[in-house]
Amino acid sequence: MRYWGKLLGLVLGVMYAPGVVGALLGLLVGHMVDRALGAKRRGFFADQQTRQSLFFRTTFQVMGHLTKAKGRVTEVDIQLASQLMDRMQLHGAARTAAQQAFREGKESHFPLRKTLQEFRRVCFGRFDLIRIFLEIQLQAAFADGSLHPNERQVLYVIAEELGISRGQFDQFLRMFDGGRQFGGHGGWQGQQGGYSQSGYQRAPQGPTLEDACKVLGVNSSDDSVAIKRAYRKLMGEHHPDKLVAKGLPPEMMEMAKQKAQEIQAAYDLIKREKGFK
């Protein structure tokens, strides 16, 4: 059914410019429309295995690129990446593939924007997958306990290519920062700390009401209805089985579970502090 654009273009072309020239111009415009719609359809109907494979490869490619942004990949960086692979229980061929993708991302000529554009196309209409992808990259950026200015700039590029505005990204960053206090996905070595506009800061031990509100993306002054709505939305977006069905690699299912546990812990803390069920 990829001829409707050409047919419509032909009709409109003849209507506005009678003759061969109008017909040719209409067909040309219609052909371009058909190609654009076809690309969107391919993204929307990409099979699950294709999305999972691309998600897996792109995750480690971009992670390698992000790590290299600081200037030089150190042994600590490699160890942190290996810890993530351990959390995913990657062994054998899967681990080798992840390591190869990580090395590809470190190359100076790695096409970051093009890679992200292809990833976004295949994830068409699945923002929850894009959200998980960005959360994993934030883990990589904060793995050593701080956010390098160059890493921040790369993260802005990642967000931009994935259709996330600067304001949305800053909200992601605040939510991620709150999650670090719950001992979840925010740090591979259990660092405690926070990030503000001025940089990395030491945070008090143990999560606070403010931390929990950051995780859910709400304010401490919000009522129970707004908080419950935010909680349910986040839990729905991070449901491991649903994410795998949409294209999350099975290897990353454990990370989705940990994020869901973090959201639950934050919600429980808010309920205790604010006194509602």
Curated annotation (Swiss-Prot):
This protein's record includes keyword Flavoprotein: no
Periplasmic topology ranges: 1-6
Keyword Magnesium: no
Any one Gene Ontology molecular-function term assigned to this protein's record: protein-folding chaperone binding
Gene3D superfamilies the UniProt entry points to: DnaJ domain, TerB-like
A Pfam family it matches: DnaJ
Keywords per UniProt: Cell inner membrane, Cell membrane, Chaperone, Membrane, Transmembrane, Transmembrane helix
Entries under InterPro entries matching the protein: DjlA, DjlA_DnaK_co-chaperone, DjlA_N, DnaJ_domain, J_dom_sf, TerB-like
HAMAP family (UniProt xref): DjlA (MF_01153)
Protein's name according to its UniProt entry: Co-chaperone protein DjlA
